[in-house]
A protein has these predicted regions:
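Domain-level signal for soluble alpha/beta catalytic cores
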Residues: 1-211
Length: 211
């Protein structure tokens, strides 16, 4: 509990050492797993402080940018971005985990988030995790049409099958994943990657897509 800052600083330093000088390293932040209530000022302050502590540590560790990802609702995104912006102008990408219609799992939609977060100064907005690339084309297209910000798309390798052991198995192969990601690029995504179920093979398959 008291090692948050040290752990985050060390992780950034290790990552930068691993990739060398020519690759940017993003400091990663995510949901707390609990819905944020905008009417609960004390709860919001706790959330703000938690995100601010982590963001400061990532910046101190040398992160080139911050990625706020797999966010479950608009309200927690606001707390995270306001916390980061209280520290300065480091580049921030924010992606939400959504259903195929763009609805978030806690509150609001990714479209509502895009409007609010653009006003707060994020540098890119988009979606990650939750579903496969085959279910996000309309969401990406709508985001691209409503904002001038770069659109991020980092979906799962399809929808998982949960085994009796509790293990999640993703059936979408790398070539199929890349083909669907190509459609997301055509729909407006300019920053792409993968989330659950993807491996270096999947990311490698994306390199062949037209930029």
């Amino acid at each position: 509990q008291n090692e948050v800052s040290r752990i985050n600083r060390d992780l950034v330093k290790l990552s930068k050492k691993a990739v060398g000088e020519h690759i940017l390293v993003a400091g990663d932040m995510t949901t707390t797993g609990k819905p944020a209530d905008p009417e609960d000022s004390a709860g919001y302050q706790l959330l703000f402080d938690a995100y601010r502590e982590q963001a400061q540590a990532l910046i101190d560790g040398g992160a080139d940018l911050l990625g706020v990802e797999t966010m479950m609702g608009v309200n927690e995104c606001i707390a995270a971005i306001e916390a980061i912006r209280s520290l300065g102008d480091i580049a921030v990408l924010c992606t939400l985990s959504v259903q195929s219609d763009g609805k978030c799992y806690f509150d609001g939609t990714v479209f509502e988030a895009a409007e609010v977060l653009q006003a707060l100064g994020v540098d890119a907005i988009g979606v990650n995790c939750s579903t496969g690339p085959d279910q996000l084309e309309s969401v990406v297209r709508a985001l691209h049409e409503m904002t001038d910000l770069p659109i991020v798309a980092k979906p799962n390798a399809g929808m998982p099958k949960i085994l009796e052991t509790g293990e999640a198995v993703y059936s979408m192969q790398a070539d199929t994943f890349a083909a669907h990601m190509g459609q997301l690029v055509e729909a407006g995504a300019s920053l792409i990657g993968g989330c659950c179920g993807t491996t270096p093979e999947y990311i490698g398959a994306l390199r062949g897509l037209k930029r």
